[in-house]
Amino acid sequence: MYNEEGECGTGAVVPWAGRLWVITYGPHKPMGSSDKLYEITPGLKQIIRPESIGGTPANRMIHKESNQLNIGPYFIDQKRKVRVIPYASMPGRHTGTARHLKDPANKLYVATMEEGLYSVDVHDLSVVEHVKDGNPNKKYRGQGIKTKLPGYHGKGLYSSQGTLVYANNGERGKNVTKDPTTTSGALATWQGSGDWKLVRRNQFTEVTGPGGIYGNADDKDPIWAMGWDARSLILMLLENGKWHPYRLPKGSHSYDGAHGWNTEWPRIREIGQKDLLGTMHGTFWRFPEAFSKTNSAGIAPRSNYLKVIGDFARWKGRIVFGCDDSAQKEFLNHRPFKSTKGAPLQSNSNLWFVEAEKIDQLGPAIGRGSVWLRDDLEAGQVSEPHLFSGYDHRMMVIRHGNRKPVAFTLEVDKKGDGKWKVLQKFKVENSLVHIFRDTEKGAWLRLRVAEKVKQATVHFHYRDKDLRGKGNGPIFDGVATLGTKASSKGVIRSNRKVLSMLAGGAYYELNDRLELTRGAKSGAALVAEGAQPKTKIRVDTASAIVEEDGSSYRIPMSPGYDAQDE
């Protein structure tokens, strides 16, 4: 899937009316773009719908009463008829769709990434504005109010228990690209009128419940919201009108950033198995469909991944992941040791078709999370619960800044039923490292202090066993190793619909049918300019050396490499 924008992410992937429907998005396009609505047949024929108007959409919901799919600005019935709400009538980057609080049989809500909120009549597609979209727009004359909700870069939207829940995961400001501890994001509610009401000032993404893409069937059903801060992932549970926090470890820190730009749209979705599948910070999560305050056990990592996933669904026996693969614009990815012209010439992304069992066979799960991170604590303070189960190996580090030893009490919720018992007590002078035994079990762990504590940190390191063996998988057979005698080298670059390669002075192109042809020399310059500069990476007899921001970093180097060889 291609567009003419700086990025081509996958906003939504939904099986509907015997087909798979997919939308892509460009970066910050509140009034439309070159992106498309795709209809994919069971035989994997890709149909680009002529109704496409693009934008930056990632919202999707199946409206049961009218038997329609809302995906982006499009409404699709069972006969695959597509109707469109133009951005002139509903401006903004559509990020979430939810069931209506007052008239769910005939209306739904659509929220935007700049905190806008609309009601849409599913029959005539008329629109009513409740909260104005934050993008400048002098032409649109809606009746909504201007929000005062902090944060920006909206993500999830869901309704239940008489409330609409909205999440954003970003912040504006000069520090957001450098300091991940910057206060950022918001989890908010709306009760049918007025402005968003702040629930928690952290970065949040997915908001959903047991009803998934259809919305909750019972208005008493819970809502789950997934987010993070500098310490860990954050899972919020709304049950019986009250919020309950939980913390999970991060599988990767690559998705961090107070700006919120690195996550795309994490999801918790049904995939035809007992448990739901969650994606967040590089981990595939097993998420119990009946997760609640008294039934919170069972969240567990399945594996770690390196993709950036926007949405996914089960279709024709496989899990289809819509990814954000190759952007023409480099955004924040500017480094002195990489080419300034190495990005693909045209943004593109693909669908990743995966057998369900493969999800458990990817990268070994790792997790890192804190309940306190250089925090000053009050006497009697109790941490939020942190995941304690699901990993083969678990370790905890405690540090504090008091002059005298501090007592930390560990409490465990063994069954996930909300009943806490003391697991162990530690007297910590300055720091402590504790490796948990296999006999120390439970769903959740929390800590308690009896006195004031300065600069307290409690951090968890988790990992699974790596069962992959020492050898590389067969997918790497075509890559030259240190001992390969017959090899070739060159520079490759994504060049619109082909892969271009410059090797040995000759220029080649590889198409989507894996046909390699020698091309005209005119394409060689495009590839050559993408070559990696050598000025910031060097080697000596001890190691490889990378220079960045005035500092030098040494990286281990195999002794088989000759430091004098290029």
Model-derived regions: residue spans:
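Repeated scaffold domains used in trafficking and secretory/extracellular systems
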Residues: 5-11, 52-66, 89-106, 134-162, ...
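Beta-propeller domains
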Residues: 18-55, 72-86, 120-124, 130-132, ...
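Entry beta-strands of beta-propeller and related beta-repeat scaffolds
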Residues: 19-22, 65-70, 103-109, 159-167, ...
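Short glycine/acidic-enriched loop and turn motifs that connect beta-strands
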Residues: 27-31, 76, 115-116, 171-174, ...
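Beta-propeller blade signature
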Residues: 35-42, 119, 179-194, 235-239, ...
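Loop/turn-rich, solvent-exposed surfaces of beta-rich toroidal or solenoidal domains
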Residues: 223-225, 233, 246-292, 386-389
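Blade-level signature of beta-propeller repeat domains, shared across WD40, Kelch, NHL, RCC1
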Residues: 311-373
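Noncatalytic modules at the cell exterior or secretory-pathway interfaces
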Residues: 438-455
